[in-house]
Amino acid sequence: MILPVVAYGHPVLKRVAEDIEPDYPNLQQLIADMFETMYHSEGVGLAAPQINKSIRLFVIDADPFHETYPEAKGFKKVFINPEIVEVSEETWTFREGCLSLPDMNEEVVRPSKITINYLDENFVEHEEEFDGIKARVIQHEYDHLEGKVYVDRVAPMRKMMLKNKLRNISEGNVAVDYKMIFPNKKRR
């Protein structure tokens, strides 16, 4: 089932998400719905807060990046209760977008390599190191679990310049091809 994506300004995007347990109701269906929503919205990642669920879960399929970044081919994963435990000092700047901030892309500086502990969809524990585009997509989705969106990482002056655009998104004054929930949409 395709779920609506919450837009910038929604309170759930500012909350630190809660850990989940193996008995979380209908978890496998939720994961399937998140992948379906992500594909329908043409995203490469989707975090549970983006579908109005404040839980520590995100899904990734970075395959659309594989022509530019061959290591992204077939990179599809589920991350439950993740924790980034190490980041490199080396950074990488990349223009990011987000399903909760449609029609926007901004340069974001992030560590180029990370180590992350997480549970997969079967609650099997993993500790893995990722770099490049894989690390980038993981960090972007992880931020959603920490109550952050990528514009929180842009320079303060640049964020001020985006104020009107961000307000328009939160009010629903943006064209999108997928279902969204706009927190400040004006009733007419």
Residue ranges and their predicted role:
Residues 1-139, 144-188:
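Active-site rim/adjacent substrate-binding subdomains
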